[in-house]
Amino acid sequence: MKDINEIKELIPHRYPILMVDRLEELEPGHRAKGVKNVSANEPFLQGHFPDRPLMPGVLQIEAMAQVGACALMSLPENEGKLAVFGGVDKVKFKRQVQPGDVLSIEVELTRVKGSIGKGEGKVYVGDELAAQGQLTFALVEK
C-alpha cells in the first residue's frame, strides 16, 4: 500500500486535481488499484451541480489516468520522466458518483512499448461499476 506522500513521489498532481488518496495494490508496469474518497468539500462539486452534487465523469477518467500513471511511473527505468494522458476510448459511465462515495480505481496496463502505454481502467463504488474505459499514456522527459 502507498499513502498520499508516496503517490506524490510517483505523479506530479496536487490539490485540487489529485484524484487518488492511496494505492492499495501496485504491480510496477502492470497494474494498480487506488482509492478516492469523494468528499462533500470537493471544489468541483460547487458547480456540478449545486442542488445535486455529482462527480464529473471527466474526473473519473482522470482518476483512472492517475492510477495508471502510478503503475507506469513505478518502474525504475521511468524515473525522471512524466506520464501524460494521451487519450481515452470506449468510455462508459454506469453509475453516478456523489459525495460520500468511495471509489475503487483499477487500471491494468495492457501494452507498454517504448514511450507509449495502453491500459484498461475501471472505477467502482462498492461492487458497482461506475465507469470504464481504455487509456493511452505517453512518457515524456520532465
UniProtKB/Swiss-Prot annotation:
Keyword field: Cytoplasm, Lipid A biosynthesis, Lipid biosynthesis, Lipid metabolism, Lyase
Record-level GO BP terms: fatty acid biosynthetic process; lipid A biosynthetic process
GO molecular-function term, one example from the UniProt record: (3R)-hydroxyacyl-[acyl-carrier-protein] dehydratase activity
Active-site feature positions: H48
Keyword Lipid metabolism on entry: yes
Keyword Lipid metabolism: yes
Domain of life: Bacteria
GO cellular component: cytoplasm; membrane
Enzyme class: lyase
EC number: 4.2.1.59
Catalytic reaction list: a (3R)-hydroxyacyl-[ACP] = a (2E)-enoyl-[ACP] + H2O
Compartments (UniProt record): Cytoplasm
Function: Involved in unsaturated fatty acids biosynthesis. Catalyzes the dehydration of short chain beta-hydroxyacyl-ACPs and long chain saturated and unsaturated beta-hydroxyacyl-ACPs.
Family: Belongs to the thioester dehydratase family. FabZ subfamily.
Protein name: 3-hydroxyacyl-[acyl-carrier-protein] dehydratase FabZ
Organism: Natranaerobius thermophilus (strain ATCC BAA-1301 / DSM 18059 / JW/NM-WN-LF)
Taxonomic lineage of the native organism: Bacteria, Bacillati, Bacillota, Clostridia, Natranaerobiales
